[in-house]
């Protein structure tokens, strides 16, 4: 069975529309940087006027180009459709870094067809670069003012020498009494840990700077763009249980340069059998 994908013409149109949206969202997001007013969602996570304004801009561009497509965004909701076309929007992935004035945040846009990611962009406004991918077309890095170039994950490495990106330890070992994911055990098993965080670390996996990246807490609007970019760069993705099916509906993500490394990471973070429910 043929898996869904965009045609070359559809991809060109999609890139033109999404890149036009990024010009507007970049300007808004960067205009608020270092003078952010923070509000808190019911789950305790930060949200800013830039988050909401940027998502409104993204929605406007998607609706103008594809008025009949389904749409789900972090700030204004929607429905995750498993049939037909569905856009996933995260206006600022890494708001915790953004509110501190740190440049390690990004805008995520992805397109699902029949529940599968077929297109995704990781836009890093402060770094002025975009990692983008479409099924069957590979993964590319485009720096503002330059030309897009294909990128690939690093050569396969064993876990003991791997370079691993992580957002935080707090979501696992320091929360909920040490579970469910044992990131401290993973840190001891791997070669080098860098607390890069959020979408930036997955962009670095795509170009072979990091060997792997993980996040224990994820949403569909996070996973869609990150997964297709890593896959098209030649990497391997799953949730932390090792599951691939319906990945955008999972609650965690691990991306690695090879299936062997990804499976080793999943084993390292999993609780002992005696602690599993």
Model regions: which residues?
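Conserved beta-strand termini and adjacent loop/short-helix elements that scaffold enzyme active sites
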Residues: 41, 74, 196-198, 240
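Acidic beta-strand-loop-alpha-helix segment within the catalytic core
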Residues: 110-202, 250-277
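Oxyanion/phosphate-interacting regions
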Residues: 1-16, 20, 181-188, 202-277
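Active-site-adjacent structural elements in enzyme catalytic cores
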Residues: 64, 72, 80-145, 228-231
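Conserved beta-strand segments of alpha/beta enzyme cores
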Residues: 37, 70, 191-192, 236
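Short, Asp-centered acidic motifs that coordinate Mg2+ and/or phosphate
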Residues: 70, 119, 163, 211-212
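N-terminal subdomain of lithium-sensitive/metallo-dependent phosphomonoesterases centered on the IMPase/IPPase/PAP
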Residues: 1-92, 274-277
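Residue-level signal for inorganic ion chemistry
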Residues: 25, 29, 51, 62, ...
């Amino acid at each position: 069975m043929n898996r869904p994908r965009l045609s070359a013409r559809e991809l060109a149109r999609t890139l033109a529309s999404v890149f036009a949206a990024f010009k507007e969202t970049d300007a808004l997001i960067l205009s608020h940087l270092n003078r952010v007013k923070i509000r808190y969602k019911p789950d305790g996570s930060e949200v800013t006027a830039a988050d909401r304004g940027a998502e409104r801009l993204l929605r406007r561009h998607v609706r103008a180009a594809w008025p009949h497509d389904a749409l789900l965004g972090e700030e204004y909701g929607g429905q995750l459709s498993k049939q037909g076309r569905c856009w996933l929007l995260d206006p600022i992935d890494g708001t915790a870094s953004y509110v501190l004035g740190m440049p390690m945040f990004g805008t995520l846009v992805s397109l699902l067809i029949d529940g599968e990611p077929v297109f995704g962009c990781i836009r890093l406004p402060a770094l002025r670069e975009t990692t983008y991918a479409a099924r069957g077309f590979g993964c590319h890095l485009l720096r503002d003012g330059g030309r897009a170039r294909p990128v690939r994950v690093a050569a396969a490495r064993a876990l003991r020498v791997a370079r691993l990106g992580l957002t935080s330890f707090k979501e696992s070992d320091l929360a909920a009494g040490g579970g469910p994911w044992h990131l401290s055990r993973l840190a001891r098993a791997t070669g080098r840990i860098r607390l890069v965080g959020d979408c930036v670390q997955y962009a670095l996996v795509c170009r072979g700077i990091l060997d792997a990246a993980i996040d224990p807490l994820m949403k569909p609007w996070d996973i869609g763009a990150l997964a297709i970019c890593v896959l098209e760069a030649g990497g391997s993705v799953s949730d932390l249980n090792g599951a691939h099916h319906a990945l955008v509906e999972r609650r965690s993500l691990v991306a690695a340069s090879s299936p062997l490394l990804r499976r080793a990471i999943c084993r390292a973070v999993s609780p002992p059998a005696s602690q599993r429910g």
